[in-house]
């Protein structure tokens, strides 16, 4: 077997100590082009970065730790800022950040999360999370297969959305044509609508 299990803390460096939180009010005077990351991704843009490179970010607290309504782990690359609601990691041994990101997003971490009203994945527990590690070539192939699968899903979603819009348009068109008398041939020998209304009026009076 070429795979093994190892704790996340043994293959990563943690950079949480370099994070700097800035509240929304103070960010008003710092507007700029650099992404400002929180637990679930970009929440603002500021005028200077505190990180420059490629990092793995993992949400530290909040409801998303349980609900997973958006990815818990994601890649930040280039120049950016991170607040104290996302752990920030780099890896050892050329292990691709994408490999770890995809793994973290594929498993439930309930065992490592503390708190109920305010769920939290603290740094010590983060380091203890077991991760399956394969040879680098296999890791790269896994990443490729996942990306291709996600791309297929996205294309299918786009096609499905387009078809649903077309169905809505067709539905409206059919109703419109139906009540304009365009779905059935017009027979001059048929009694007119006026004649029908006269008959209804007579029936009501009788």
Per-region residue spans from a language model:
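A short beta-sheet element
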Residues: 38-40, 48-105, 114-126
């Amino acid at each position: 077997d070429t795979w093994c299990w190892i704790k996340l803390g043994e293959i990563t460096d943690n950079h949480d100590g370099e994070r700097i939180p800035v509240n929304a009010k103070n960010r008003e005077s710092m507007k700029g082009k650099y992404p400002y990351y929180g637990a679930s991704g970009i929440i603002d843009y500021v005028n200077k970065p505190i990180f420059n490179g490629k990092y793995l970010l993992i949400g530290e607290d909040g409801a998303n730790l349980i609900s997973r309504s958006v990815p818990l782990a994601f890649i930040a690359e280039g120049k950016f800022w991170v607040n104290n609601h996302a752990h920030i990691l780099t890896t050892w041994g050329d292990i691709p950040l994408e490999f770890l990101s995809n793994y973290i997003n594929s498993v439930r971490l309930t065992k490592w999360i503390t708190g109920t009203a305010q769920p939290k994945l603290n740094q010590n527990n983060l380091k203890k999370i077991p991760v399956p590690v394969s040879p680098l070539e296999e890791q790269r192939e896994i990443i490729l297969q996942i990306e291709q699968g996600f791309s297929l899903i996205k294309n299918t979603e786009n096609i499905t959305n387009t078809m649903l819009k077309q169905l809505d348009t067709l539905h409206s068109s059919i109703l419109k044509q139906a009540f304009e008398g365009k779905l059935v041939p017009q027979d001059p020998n048929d009694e007119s609508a006026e004649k029908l209304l006269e008959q209804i009026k007579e029936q009501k009076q009788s």
